[in-house]
């Protein structure tokens, strides 16, 4: 059983338990209506299913924090149903269900170090590095002088994900991507 905290102390990226289901807080908002009691609106991702749900709590409520073990592991491979990660300290392999990693899966590359969350020894989800460098494998060609950064085009990166990039990005360029938002940050020198 986790520690209970006042709902007003909730923070982004905290792990909470709602109806015995583990969630990661994506966003929250304190609302004080003109009439009636203040409340907190919480958007949270179910760590087992990957679904994002919105909850509303009275400002007087308390919520239970989930207590997960966090381990650094390296991504190995997928069989379509599970994603497999290697704990480099114990050489144990852990399988995370694909449905729990819908967003994260598109930015995983072989050997990438991630944080795996374990609930009583069972993996329930991962956290990618905030920023990661990827190679562009497919995009429309850029032209010399295309330096306007407010116009974007789609580019496919080595993992198969598509990211919107400035016009000057070409196939073979390496780019830094915000893995949480799936957005381009900058071009990286080779």
UniProtKB/Swiss-Prot annotation:
* A Gene Ontology biological process term: peptide biosynthetic process
Q: What is its main location?
A: cytoplasm
The protein's location, in the record's own words, is: Cytoplasm
Q: Name one GO molecular function term.
A: translation elongation factor activity
Q: Transmembrane stretches, by residue range?
A: none
What InterPro entries does the database record attribute to this sequence? Answer: Elong-fact-P_C (IPR015365), NA-bd_OB-fold (IPR012340), Rib_uL2_dom2 (IPR014722), Transl_elong_fac_P/YeiP (IPR020599), Transl_elong_KOW-like (IPR013185), Transl_elong_P/YeiP_cen (IPR001059), Transl_elong_P/YeiP_CS (IPR013852), Transl_elongation_fac_P (IPR011768)
In which pathway does this enzyme or protein participate? Protein biosynthesis; polypeptide chain elongation
Q: Does the keyword Cytoplasm apply?
A: yes
What Pfam family does this protein match (any one)?
EFP_N
Alphabetized, the UniProt keywords read: Cytoplasm, Elongation factor, Protein biosynthesis
A GO cellular component annotation in the UniProt record: cytoplasm
NCBIfam families, per database record: efp, PRK00529.1
- Function (record text): Involved in peptide bond synthesis. Stimulates efficient translation and peptide-bond synthesis on native or reconstituted 70S ribosomes in vitro. Probably functions indirectly by altering the affinity of the ribosome for aminoacyl-tRNA, thus increasing their reactivity as acceptors for peptidyl transferase.
UniProt lists the family membership as follows: Belongs to the elongation factor P family.
In Swiss-Prot or TrEMBL terms, this protein is called: Elongation factor P
Native source species:
Sulfurihydrogenibium sp. (strain YO3AOP1)
Q: What is the lineage of its organism?
A: Bacteria, Pseudomonadati, Aquificota, Aquificia, Aquificales
